[in-house]
Amino acid sequence: MPIKYWALQFKVISNEFLHINEVVAKASKRLHILRVLKRGGEPPADLLKVYFALIRSVLEYCCAVWHNALPVKLSDSIERVQKRTLRIIFLALHYQEALATTGCVPLHTRRMELCSKLFTKIKEPESRLRHLVPPTQLQAHGRSLRNKDRPSLISCKTERFKQSFLPAMCLYAHGM
């Protein structure tokens, strides 16, 4: 039985992300707009703006919630949409060349940057969510250690919780 929460849909029984499949399907439908604009003779710069506004925004919606727990197979299916987009815009270029030409990064890297940016905002003292972040090692132990500004690690009993946003970002802050 699927549970719908903030327009994200998770299938509880099989641990499959239905939301990702829906997002990929929705973004794939929007690729038709790019094809029509390409046939109409729009320049690549305008096609990229359309991609950023209509397609990539759909692919990255609420990515902080699901990015760390995303299996490689589903991450690749999201990345495939960007590959198809860049193939439509730049017919003659391979994916890596198209990324270099546009200045884009792979979506996995971009999602990780967005998660890190959100975690940094949450750690700020004026953030309303600051109480969710574990104390820094200096606050927890009172000792001036080498890594005193890093948040303490959250003890996790299950892998599922370990892959959720806050524990995963604390591990990422420690370079693990």
Label every model-predicted segment:
Residues 1-176:
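Hydrophobic/basic alpha-helical segments
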